[in-house]
């Protein structure tokens, strides 16, 4: 098809192909999901083709600006791009918010950006670079922390990316801030559009202390639990338990992790661990600490 031949969706004029950039990034993730399914079905040739297509996100990365940018029908990056702007090239978001939409290959995105240090700097900027006070934001940009828009779902996984660069305490800090300040027990308690339940789903996962950055990977990046004890009674008859006995609004930082009583050194849990009825214990404190082994392997 045309998209595959061009390796991305292009704009023949400013608004000819609405959301061309965000479509390119999201289709690359869709292709990855197809590849995973094909691999499970033993369709190796199909899997290889769609794994290749899932790398098309690299075709809209501009190393001159370090952002994803739309291309015109000649293949050139469209002039006048600013990551702050909300344009027809990106669905209800700006260049800051869609830059991270490579859930299938975060390690590859880190390399593309220039390595862990540069990626960490860009993450910091995402949460500290505030819109101008006189800037009138669109109605979907709510729950803002810097350029992070919790009220609009494309940003939801970004908080958990600090795990990938050895700074999990920042994931814990921002996850706690969002849970405690942007969700209220009121009739208008959500800071944005629920959109098929995603605002609530983010909260439920994050309150348990983890979140599926790449939902088809079978991994859940560890954040910070909200409650001292959570139990999931599973359909297979087993019970998955999360314990954090000393967690409170100050003790948001994980000091150590045990799974089934054994020390655990990763910044993610697996679907298999959950379904096995594991018990995860978090030792919490008010002091940030590095935990886990990071950047050790590609996403599955």
Language-model segments: residues:
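Hydrophobic, small-residue-rich alpha-helical packing segments that form membrane-like cores
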Residues: 12-16, 22-30
């Amino acid at each position: 098809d045309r998209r595959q031949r061009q390796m991305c969706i292009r704009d023949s004029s400013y608004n000819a192909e609405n959301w061309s950039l965000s479509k390119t990034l999201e289709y690359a993730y869709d292709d990855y999901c197809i590849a995973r399914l094909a691999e499970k079905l033993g369709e190796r040739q199909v899997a290889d083709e769609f794994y290749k297509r899932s790398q098309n996100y690299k075709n809209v990365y501009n190393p001159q600006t370090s952002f994803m940018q739309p291309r015109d029908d000649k293949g050139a990056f469209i002039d006048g791009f600013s990551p702050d702007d909300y344009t027809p090239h990106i669905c209800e978001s700006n260049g800051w918010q869609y830059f991270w939409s490579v859930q299938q290959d975060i390690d590859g995105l880190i390399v593309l950006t220039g390595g862990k240090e540069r990626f960490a700097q860009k993450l910091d900027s995402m949460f500290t670079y505030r819109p101008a006070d006189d800037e009138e934001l669109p109605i979907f940009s709510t729950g803002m922390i810097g350029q992070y828009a919790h009220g609009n779902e494309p940003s939801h996984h970004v908080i958990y990316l600090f795990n990938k660069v050895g700074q999990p305490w920042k994931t814990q800090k921002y996850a706690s801030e969002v849970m405690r300040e942007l969700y209220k027990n009121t009739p208008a308690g959500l800071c944005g559009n629920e959109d098929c339940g995603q605002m609530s789903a983010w909260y439920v996962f994050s309150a348990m202390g983890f979140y599926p950055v790449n939902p088809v990977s079978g991994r859940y990046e560890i954040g910070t639990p909200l409650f001292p004890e959570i139990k999931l009674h599973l359909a297979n008859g087993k019970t998955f338990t999360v314990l954090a006995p000393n967690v409170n609004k100050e003790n948001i930082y994980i000091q150590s992790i045990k799974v089934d009583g054994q020390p655990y050194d990763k910044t993610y849990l697996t679907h298999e661990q959950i379904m096995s009825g594991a018990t995860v214990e978090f030792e919490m404190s008010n002091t940030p600490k590095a935990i886990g082994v990071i950047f050790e392997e590609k996403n599955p």
